[in-house]
Swiss-Prot record:
Enzyme Commission code: 7.1.1.-
Xref: PROSITE patterns: COMPLEX1_49K
Topology relative to the membrane: Peripheral membrane protein
Catalytic reaction(s) noted: a quinone + NADH + 5 H(+)(in) = a quinol + NAD(+) + 4 H(+)(out)
Gene Ontology MF: a single term: NADH:ubiquinone reductase (non-electrogenic) activity
Function: NDH-1 shuttles electrons from NADH, via FMN and iron-sulfur (Fe-S) centers, to quinones in the respiratory chain. The immediate electron acceptor for the enzyme in this species is believed to be a menaquinone. Couples the redox reaction to proton translocation (for every two electrons transferred, four hydrogen ions are translocated across the cytoplasmic membrane), and thus conserves the redox energy in a proton gradient.
UniProt keyword annotations, A-Z: Cell membrane, Membrane, NAD, Quinone, Translocase, Transport
Localisation per UniProt entry: Cell membrane
One GO CC term on file: plasma membrane
A matching Pfam family: Complex1_49kDa
Listed name of the protein: NADH-quinone oxidoreductase subunit D
Predominant location: membrane
Length: 432
């Protein structure tokens, strides 16, 4: 082999034909185009550097970093409890998963995982599954819009509005609520919370059926998604791909089953898989997972029992029954009485908890949850102080974007849109 000889090693799709064509192609026939970072089909500020020959993508590379927020670095300067407010803003379409993963890590470092009240775990599971539905609705709605199916977009966003309104009534915010806290949740469900949740689930059934009726057997939709964005099991394992992309290869990998957390082992649900390794299989997985999430939420409502929503150790956890005063300003008299009405020591503990934060024993842990996009992991390091020494997130969108080249090179430019939509990346989680 000479120094000038080019060696290309690749696999999947029609790579052999691509290599043969590349050897005899005139370099002048190829052009490099930038798709994004401002483009309606890249799911945010994702830049795709494409080398194309006619309508064929010969090389695809991702350019990221346009939404960098420095959240992981900011966590090193905030108390452990304050960190929830930051992490909820990373993958902004599934904030409850960011919060839960963070809190599970803090609780594991504190050694209080087994002390979390049952009601807290039920509420966490319920909020995560509602969030899974809302996230999948955005994936299907935007994916349909990018391929020219406008009606599913309207159906999906109207259905998502039901869930966001529910989040607002429970947490006070539609998104990024910082509701999950180390040791519990910020506050209990409102008195009519279970009734509102049951009504929301009932209202979601019709739009979910309508979404399936529009696309499941739609000939145009199937032509645009079947055998497009192909990535088999070997490719997924080599790249560390998880979530619906991995399950579209037929492997039933779901952390809720393989490594249960928050009591998921107590719920009955199926891990949805497909065997096409393509965009259509990922679409069907998301459709069916929404119905499985509804099953889980219904079981949560059955398991919901009265009880505390925060661990009882007031040296570790803020009170979870914060109420605003009758004038709309400050804390309510009941809340103030609970903080300082028992003893001066109780007031001192509360003051130190708010002004200094909790001290977490030195150590490091890794905790992962099954987000709508795959394995969302947190590597958390404590030096024994009141702030994290380091918190690193393994965001599935970042990992899954590695598959863009394998899914799209050798295919048409139009199929690249399908491949990216089937990955469903959220750039807030990619760049952090």
């Amino acid at each position: 082999m000479t120094d000038t000889e080019t060696v290309l090693v690749a696999g999947g799709q029609d790579w052999n034909e691509i290599v043969e064509a590349a050897r005899g192609a005139d370099p002048g026939e190829r052009i490099v185009v930038n798709m994004g970072p401002q483009h309606p089909s890249t799911h945010g500020v994702l830049r795709l550097i494409l080398e194309i020959e006619g309508e064929t993508v010969t090389e695809a590379r991702c350019g990221i970093g346009y939404l960098h927020t420095g959240i992981e670095k900011n966590l090193e300067y905030r108390y452990w409890t304050q960190g929830v407010t930051f992490v909820t803003r990373m993958d902004y379409l599934s904030p409850f998963f960011n919060e839960t993963a963070y809190c599970l890590g803090v609780e594991k470092l504190l050694g209080i995982t087994d002390e979390i009240p049952e009601r807290v775990n039920v509420i966490r599971v319920m909020m995560m599954e509602l969030n899974r539905i809302s996230s999948h609705l955005v994936a299907l709605a935007t994916g349909g819009m990018e391929l020219g199916a406008m009606t599913p977009m309207f159906v999906g966003f109207r259905a998502r509005e039901i869930i966001l309104s529910l989040f607002e009534s429970i947490t006070g915010l539609r998104m990024n609520s910082a509701y999950i806290r180390p040791g519990g949740v910020a506050q209990d469900l409102p008195p009519d919370g279970p009734t509102e949740i049951a009504k929301a689930i009932a209202d979601l059934r019709q739009p979910l059926r309508e979404m399936g009726d529009l696309l499941n057997e739609n000939a145009i939709w199937k032509a645009r998604t079947q055998d497009v964005g192909y990535l088999d099991l070997a490719g997924c394992m080599a790249l560390g791909i998880t979530g619906p992309i991995l399950r579209s290869t037929g492997l039933p990998h779901d952390l809720r089953k393989s490594e249960p957390y928050c009591g998921y082992e107590n719920y009955e649900f199926d891990v949805i898989t497909a065997d096409g390794c393509d965009a259509y299989g990922r679409y069907m997985i998301r459709v069916k997972e929404m119905w499985e999430s509804i099953k889980i939420v219904e079981q949560c409502l059955d398991r919901l029992r009265p009880g505390p929503t925060m661990i009882e150790d007031r040296k570790l956890a803020w009170p979870a029954d914060l109420k605003v005063g009758p004038d709309g300003m400050g804390n309510s008299p009941e809340h103030i009485a609970k903080i300082m009405g028992s003893s001066m020591e109780a007031l001192i503990h509360h003051f130190k908890l708010v002004t200094e934060g909790i001290r977490v024993p030195a150590g490091q842990v890794y905790v992962a949850v099954e987000s709508p996009r795959g394995e969302l992991g947190v590597h958390m390091v404590s030096d024994g102080g009141t702030r994290p020494y380091r918190v690193h997130y393994r965001d599935p969108s970042f990992t899954n974007l590695q598959a863009v080249a394998a899914m799209s090179e050798g295919g048409m430019v139009a199929d690249l849109i399908t491949a990216v939509a089937s990955i469903d990346p959220v750039m807030g989680g990619v760049d952090r």
